Design a protein with these regions (language model features):
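Iron-associated oxidoreductase/ferritin-like identity signal
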Residues: 1-145
Length: 145
């Protein structure tokens, strides 16, 4: 594995941990509004993001690569209504998709087929995550705040 791909995967571990923070922040918002169903859904999403980070962490370890941890920034989300957390989730999923695509392109450029095989799962997962986030935005638009 080239150092560039390893570095990008290390960055993605941090991105996934940050994603977990973002979703916990959103869950906290909905919990404070008494919207337990939304809160629960985002708590589950937060756990999934942590699982993604652990998968990448183990992948680097199992391939003899150094894992480096960076500070996880605080989510800067300010929610004015019940729609804005859903829009933030969709925006964030699109960001994560772009990051995964960037790693995939680097792995492809390096003929790193093992990493590409791992990332195939992430590419599929991101398609599902973006659809779920988009569906929630659409439903909130239909039913109102």
């Amino acid at each position: 594995m080239h150092s560039n791909v390893s570095s990008l995967i290390n960055d993605q571990i941090n991105n996934e941990l940050y994603s977990s923070y973002v979703y916990l922040d959103i869950a906290n918002y909905y919990e404070s509004k008494g919207l337990d169903g939304f809160a629960n859904w985002f708590e589950i999403q937060a756990k999934e993001e942590l699982d993604h980070a652990l998968l990448l962490y183990k992948y680097l370890q199992n391939n003899g690569q150094k894992v480096t941890f960076e500070a996880i920034k605080k989510p800067e989300c300010k929610f004015d209504d019940n729609m804005s957390p859903l829009q933030e989730a969709l925006r964030h999923e699109k960001f994560i998709t772009a990051c995964i695509n960037n790693i995939y392109a680097a792995a492809n450029s390096d003929n790193d087929y093992r990493t590409m095989q791992l990332l195939d799962w992430f590419v599929k997962e991101q398609g599902e995550e973006e659809k779920n986030a988009s569906d929630l935005v659409t439903k909130m638009e239909l039913f109102g705040d």
